[in-house]
UniProtKB/Swiss-Prot annotation:
Coiled coil: none annotated. PROSITE patterns: FTHFS_1. The keyword Nucleotide-binding applies. It is an enzyme of class 6 (ligase). ATP binds at T65, P66, H67, G68, E69, G70, K71, T72. It catalyses: (6S)-5,6,7,8-tetrahydrofolate + formate + ATP = (6R)-10-formyltetrahydrofolate + ADP + phosphate. Belongs to the formate--tetrahydrofolate ligase family. InterPro entries: Formate_THF_ligase, Formate_THF_ligase_CS, P-loop_NTPase. This is Formate--tetrahydrofolate ligase. Keywords: ATP-binding, Ligase, Nucleotide-binding, One-carbon metabolism. One of its GO terms (biological process) is tetrahydrofolate interconversion.
């Protein structure tokens, strides 16, 4: 079989202007980037206001493993098959961060014959949205440092006299706004800034990866440019010496940050291998932020297509949960059905059983033990009131005996249906049965529900999410978290939803607890207000906001060939 890159290069692409017109966009609503990409102007939202919406399908997965479950492959494959069946369909996915592209995970365009193309353009830069987020974020960091420098240099009276601005009295130890870069670089996690006689004052800071920026979450959750401006103004960048929040609006930098992101608020239109439209927009990580593509892209797609297929990051305890309790809660966009991706490899890896057997080899004992993880994720999706279709992403090494056993086992669960998917090797033909079953699932009456109401106490939200969302026995708040809980409630933020920042490698907070852990207590060490994004992040366990590169990073395989073409992506 050809490599992902070879398949992408041999694809026969429609001119993006033609594809956009067929999708329902007007010429003036597309800002073309060559023949393969186009920004979609938000004036289309005004034109389509009041249009009936299509069916929204959310793709999720079992607990992720290093072997890859194929969630994006399934998202794109399902989209291609729905199109092949004669439906008007659109995929909505996140823009890949270059950190994972050059790290371990690789690209995020799908794979095989279920790809968004050209895949190298999607995985590297696209139309520059992540760079815009980085620049806007770092302007905020520079504005804080500059304001602190001038206030301390001049003192309150002279600063206000010379600048005409209010004295903010920023506490150097209260600056919470790091800088960002779109790479994995562990040595930047903790740094000293402001060193040198005329560069201070010095204070401890650090870098996060751009996908972890609250600006990225804001981009993904905003309804339009005006909403994004309001949200950016609410960003808490620092604390003053009285412990009060200093916002981007108070610092006077929110307008400029928004201006940098004025084009980033527009989704990018590309296409799948069989010419289905795909909107790529925003890229928040699911272990740190809410892990879903943008509300704007979904809103546009739902008014132009019969079916919209999107995905949440990692397993159903991560991106799917946050899709429901954060994205759907804020946007009002309600899914009609869910697709839960699994593989034989994933279930064996999630079995918790030690084995010398190669993960590709038949191992009925590990498969049966790992099935509990799949069943847990099925029940997790069902508790949100959605019909869930299990998609078994087939690998070449899979045996018919194990696949048949798994299909039969799923029939005894709460899943609406179960189908094999061979979209990776067969493209649109490989997910036809899956598409037909998903269509039937979307015809079921909607019973979508959230896990907790807005008016629930903040501590009760944390407990509910731990117990119902992860199967924990309860939570344990650190002394710091208890104090922050009281402060957030007193300041009137208890109505916000909770975003758990935890490992994706286990349903629990501990990556070593495989399968379906029980009886564990979730340790909440810190609560962080994300006033602009509109949620409170609970830091659980040891979650890094700046990844590091591994021993053999992905960049080792990436180069340019003699024809000037990029090689090694995928």
């Amino acid at each position: 079989m050809l490599t992902d890159m070879e398949i992408s290069r041999r694809a026969h692409l429609k001119d993006i202007a033609q594809l956009g017109a067929e999708f329902g966009l007007l010429p003036e609503e597309m800002q073309l980037f060559g023949n393969t990409k186009a920004k979609v102007d938000l004036q289309v939202q005004q034109r389509l206001a009041g249009q009936p919406k299509g069916k929204l399908i959310i793709v999720t997965a079992v607990t992720p493993t290093p072997h890859g479950e194929g969630k994006t492959v399934t998202t794109i494959g399902l989209t291609q098959s729905l199109k092949a069946l004669g439906n008007k369909v659109c995929a909505c996915i996140r823009q890949p961060s270059m950190g994972p592209v050059f790290g371990v995970k690789g690209g995020a365009a799908g794979g095989g014959y279920a790809q968004v193309v050209p895949m190298q353009e999607l995985n590297l830069h696209l139309t520059g949205d992540i760079h815009a987020v980085s620049s806007a974020h770092n302007l905020g960091a520079a504005a804080i440092a500059s304001r602190l420098y001038h206030e301390m240099r001049l003192g309150k009276a002279e600063f206000e006299r010379q600048s005409g601005l209010s004295y903010l009295d920023i506490d150097p130890k209260g600056i919470r706004w790091h800088r960002v870069v779109d790479h994995n670089d562990r040595c930047l996690r903790e740094i000293e800034v402001g060193l040198g006689e005329n560069n201070g004052p010095a204070y401890t800071s650090g870098f996060d990866i751009t996908a972890a920026s609250e600006l990225m979450a804001i981009l993904a959750l905003s309804r339009n440019l005006t909403d994004m401006r309001v949200r950016i103004g609410k960003l808490v960048l620092a604390l003053n010496r009285q412990g009060e929040a200093v916002s981007a609006d108070e610092l006077g930098v929110a307008g400029a940050m928004t201006a940098i992101m004025a084009d980033a608020v527009k989704p990018t239109l590309m296409q799948t291998l069989n010419g289905a439209p795909c909107l790529i927009h925003a890229g928040p990580f699911a272990n740190i932020a809410h892990g879903n593509s943008s509300v704007i892209a979904d809103d546009i797609a739902l008014k132009l297509a019969d079916f919209v297929v999107t995905e949440g990051g990692f397993g159903s305890d991560m991106g799917f949960e946050k899709f429901c309790n954060i994205k759907a809660r804020q946007s009002g966009l309600i899914p009609s059905a869910a697709v839960l991706v699994t593989t034989l490899k994933a279930l064996k890896a999630n079995s918790g059983l030690a084995s010398d057997t190669d993960i590709n080899a038949p191992d009925q004992a590990r498969l049966e033990a790992g099935f509990a993880n799949l069943n847990w994720h099925i029940n997790n999706v069902v508790q949100y009131g959605l019909p869930v279709v299990v998609a078994i992403n087939r690998f070449a090494s899979d045996t018919d005996a194990e696949l048949n056993w798994l299909m039969e086992a799923v029939r005894g669960t709460a899943a609406f249906g179960c189908e094999l998917s061979e979209a990776f090797s067969q493209g649109e033909d490989g997910a036809m049965a899956l598409a037909q079953t998903v269509i039937r699932a979307c015809e079921q009456p909607s019973e979508f529900r959230l896990l907790y109401p807005d008016n629930m106490e903040l501590e009760a939200k944390l407990s509910t999410l731990a117990e119902l969302g992860y199967g924990a026995a309860g939570i344990n708040l650190s002394a710091v978290a208890k104090q922050q809980l009281q402060e957030l409630s007193a300041l009137g933020y208890a109505h916000l939803p909770v975003c758990m920042a935890k490992t994706p490698l286990s349903i629990s907070h501990d990556p070593q607890l495989k399968g379906v852990p029980q009886g564990f207590i979730v340790p909440v060490r810190e609560l962080v207000l994300n006033a602009g994004a509109g949620f409170i992040t609970a830091l659980v366990g040891n979650v890094m906001t700046m990844p590091g590169l591994g021993l053999t990073p992905g960049y080792l395989k990436i180069d340019i060939d003699v024809d000037g073409e990029i090689i090694g992506l995928g």
